[in-house]
Amino acid sequence: AGTYNIYESIPDASCVATKGILLPQAAPAPGLSGGTRCGFYYGDRFNLVNTEEHSSVYLSSKTSFDNGVNFEFDYMATDIDVLDNPQSPSYPALSYLGKPIMPGVAGSPFSYPILWLGRALGSAFPSPNAPRQNTNERISFGLNGTLMSGNTWEIHFTDSEQVHSYFQPDTSTSRFDAAIAGVGGASGTESWNLFDSSANSAELIAYISSGERRKTVADLMVLDFLITGTTDGGVDFATGLQMKKEGYNVERNDASKAVFGPDGSITQQSDLIFLGGGLENQDSRNSTAVFVEASKDVSDKLQVIGAARYEQLTSESTFDPKVSMRYQMNDNLVLRGSYSTSFREPSLSQLSTSLVSLQGLQDFNPDGTAKGSTAFIRVAVAHNPDLEPETSENTNFGAIWTPNDQTSLSVD
């Protein structure tokens, strides 16, 4: 009951009784009241240190055979479980902004349409937990030995996997919408009361409760083969082969799945009031590389090092050389220089994973003080399957001057 201005904020009638805080609002226009909103301190609900369980296993073994071949084995596994991690009872209804609540709907006591800005559950309700689990596993074994020429060889295989699972509680947009319309709950006849939270049953609260359940798996397998030694001409060298396979998978529950258009825009939101969700994906790639490096002391003063790497990627190939020289001009001065090219592939996440992040926006007054509270918005972060590797050319010239045993100056 009462008379209110257009755009005037009206707080929950039981705000203070349910441990809420009255927050005066700025006037929407000269001569109009901004009203008051009901907020609450949710920061003290979070843990500075969560209750966690940690476990780890490490095994290592080395042995030598009669033929001079050595065998190495390493295994490591870790598991971290976050057991509690309490959150806010619910989050701001970002997916429900701008929807008018008609008179008599969802317990509205007003005789005209209003806009509801709030959370499904406020300060009077307990905090749901957001458990996390992070597991890492790595196994590696290899052989090494010496050839008849005196050069050494080694081969290693490494397989690793990281699995990250979490659940972040939220509210279902579709079920919350149905409950507000009076067709919620298991029976399809229950109504959510936006204006008296104590009128909502535990069963109806469970009905609208949802969340983002996500599992991310990153795995990598690498096979390395290397030969090192010195030629008859006094050239130190290393050459080898590397084969690599990596994968990146993201699994989501249905509520947290979003759909993106070709331009990266969100064409279908997740079924969550606050969290934006994202895409599921399952992607992998292979690469094979060969490389060689050689070093030669051309004279007592000049050392030359050259290297090259050719790598065949899933969709393209790259060749990257490197050459460097070091010249001892005299006992006090060394000159050096190098030239190389390099590249870096985009990650599988950049190539195939799209998600909706949350960004907090804060407005400020002319004097720099905060104006109002932080507002959250959803921001689409889209993948780009056409990303190309970064490439670079690197040139360096330098000198090392050592005038005495106590002083050394390097310039590059």
Task: Identify the meaning behind each predicted range.
Residues N144, L387-D412:
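Charge-patterned, long linear interaction tracts outside catalytic cores
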Residues E52, S64-G68, M148-G150, D232-G234, ...:
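Outer-membrane beta-barrel channels and translocator barrels
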Residues L59-T63, F141-G145, L223-G229, V290-K296, ...:
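Residues on the lipid-exposed face of transmembrane beta-strands in outer-membrane beta-barrel proteins
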Residues S61-D66, G306:
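Glycine-rich phosphate-binding loop of nucleotide-binding enzymes
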Residues G2-E52, Y58, G68-S287, S340-D386, ...:
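Surface-exposed, low-complexity loop segments enriched in small/polar and acidic residues
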Residues T51, A218, S284, Y310-D320, ...:
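Solvent-exposed loop/turn segments connecting transmembrane beta-strands
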Residues G278-R285, E293, R309-T314, S324, ...:
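Alpha-helix capping and helix-loop boundary segments enriched in small/acidic/polar residues
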Residues L302-L313, F319, M325, L335-Y339:
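Transmembrane beta-strand segments that form the barrel wall of outer-membrane beta-barrel proteins
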